[in-house]
């Protein structure tokens, strides 16, 4: 599964990204994920990504991103993002990517 994880600049989402990679590895899943800012996501989504997950702090851009990006886009729930609940965020990614 190939996922874009977006926040304002890609910094805070990199923490969740590492947790998601660890979770995927421990469950034998193939996860290709990068953490980027929303501006970069608009530029790179066509590189084979299957879905985009938005950090809560940029959720105000959800509708705009859904119009610009032609793959599924969803907001990561605030609590899951804050505590780094990789399992719940992976479930969201699976749902978006029909996995």
Language-model regions, residue ranges each:
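CheY-like receiver
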Residues: 44-45, 92
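Conserved active-site segments centered on acidic
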Residues: 2-40
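Short acidic active-site motifs
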Residues: 39-44, 61
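Short secondary-structure boundary segments
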Residues: 56-57
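Ser/Thr/Gly-rich flexible loops in soluble cytosolic domains mediating phosphotransfer, phosphorylation
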Residues: 3, 73-99
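Short acidic/histidine-rich motifs immediately flanking catalytic phosphotransfer sites
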Residues: 47-51
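Short, structured coil segments at secondary-structure junctions
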Residues: 68-71
């Amino acid at each position: 599964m190939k996922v874009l994880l977006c926040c304002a600049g890609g910094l805070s989402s990199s923490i969740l990204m590492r947790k998601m990679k660890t979770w995927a590895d421990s469950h034998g899943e193939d996860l290709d994920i990068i953490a980027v800012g929303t501006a970069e996501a608009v530029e790179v989504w066509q590189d084979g990504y299957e879905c985009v997950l938005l950090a809560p702090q940029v959720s105000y851009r959800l509708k705009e991103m859904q119009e610009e990006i032609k793959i599924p886009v969803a907001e990561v729930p605030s609590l899951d993002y804050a505590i780094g609940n990789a399992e719940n965020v992976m479930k969201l990614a699976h749902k978006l990517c029909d996995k």
